[in-house]
Amino acid sequence: MTDMFRLDGKVAVVIGGGGGIGEIMAKGLAGQGSKVAVASRNMQKLEAVAQKIQSETKSEAAAFQVDIIDKQSVAQLVKQVLSKFGTVDILVNSQGANVKKPAVDFPVEDWDLMFQVNVKGTMLSCSEFGKVMIEKKKGKVINLSSVRGIRATLWGGNEGYSATKGAVDMITRSLASEWAPYNINVNALAPSLIYTELAAVTLRDPERLQKYLANVPLKRVGQPQDLVGACIFLASPASDFITGQILYLDGGLTAVG
């Protein structure tokens, strides 16, 4: 029986692939045989990641610079990827911005930044790469959401971030419905607290971390590697009958509250 999780011959684009969760997922997809295009602003980081992926997985990888909140830049990225690889089968939107400030003292510019990157960036990426997938009548889109899209925290400062992730959830569900006739699956990964730079504030506070883990059945913080299997699943033929779903990677957090 053919391995349903193999991605041989596929081309994946990972936005935000220059580090953190995006880099880990890009490497995971490449490990299953997919060619990978990593894209973000920092070309130096991207080139290092692409070289590392090629060295460790033997799959072809390329780096592309993009400003995800600029439509022309995203459209140019699509052209560059098509010129390099000929097609796009998988799109992963792993870009993200997270600023925590009290609601009564929340700078408008920080609010705008999160909505620009998390919401506008996701929609622009889906829109531009979606054109390619609609034409070929096949594709897999994986957005990066968060449990914060449906669940408040025990402490403040998450109003902006939570609102953007709720928006990502609805972009995901709406596109899943709109693009179903074109055989395009649109889903989202929604992790809880993951060991990344964005989670540093919580991880540095033992009391806050203890309160958080009290509500997590598996009693640990997630690792970037915990997202890889789910990403491969949603990118692979194994998930062909799954669309419009938000997959929670949270150690059981949303199951108990």
For every predicted segment, state its role.
Residues 2-4, 231-232, 243-257:
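Short C-terminal tail/terminal secondary-structure segment
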